[in-house]
Amino acid sequence: MMRVIILLLTLHVLGVSSVMSLKKKIDGPWQTIYLAASTMEKINEGSPLRTYFRHILCGRRCNQVYLYFFIKKGTKCQLYKVIGRKKQEVYYAQYEGSIAFMLKMVNEKILLFHYFNKNRRNDVTRVAGVLAKGKQLNKEEMTEFMNLVEEMGIEEENVQRIMDTDNCPSKIKP
């Protein structure tokens, strides 16, 4: 009986440890490097899904994530905060309709994400993106992103380097 209790406690500690490790990796400043979408117009300059990420916070046990990003409207950058709530492995949020998204850590400096956006007219757009702590991706990181783009059924020519048009404030207070 004592062995079972020790085993259960060990498994619980390992589970908490992995959540804390994930939280430590996700929390912090991030910048959008590339975006790709099934409908190019949705990520063109001035479009609502062209997101210039700045910060992600992982809530308790990472069951919620707080996404902070800018959208450009003309020459002005407007800051948004969107809360994703996790159900199983997928986060759900409200922004330009409903969004179902997933996050994937490549390493401590690279985070891939993909989502489905269903707007008010029930049109669905598939989006893939890569966030980074730096300004460049190495060859392996770019390959991993392009594999995600392909898995999402997004055409390679629909990939845009977002970093080049990002002139929104670099720091925010989440």
Curated annotation (Swiss-Prot):
Q: Name one GO cellular component term.
A: extracellular region
Mention any Pfam family matching this sequence. Answer: Lipocalin
Q: Known InterPro entries for this protein? A: Calycin (IPR012674), Lipocalin (IPR002345), Lipocln_cytosolic_FA-bd_dom (IPR000566), OBP-like (IPR002448)
Q: What is its main location?
A: secreted
Listed GO MF terms:
small molecule binding
**Keywords assigned:** Disulfide bond, Secreted, Signal
The protein's matches in Gene3D superfamilies, at most eight in alphabetical order, are given as: 2.40.128.20
Cell compartment(s), UniProt: Secreted
Q: List the disulfide bonds.
A: 77-168
Q: Where is the signal peptide?
A: 1-18
User: Cross-referenced SUPFAM superfamilies, in alphabetical order?
Assistant: Lipocalins
Q: Which family does it belong to?
A: Belongs to the calycin superfamily. Lipocalin family.
Listed name of the protein: Probasin
Originating species: Mus musculus
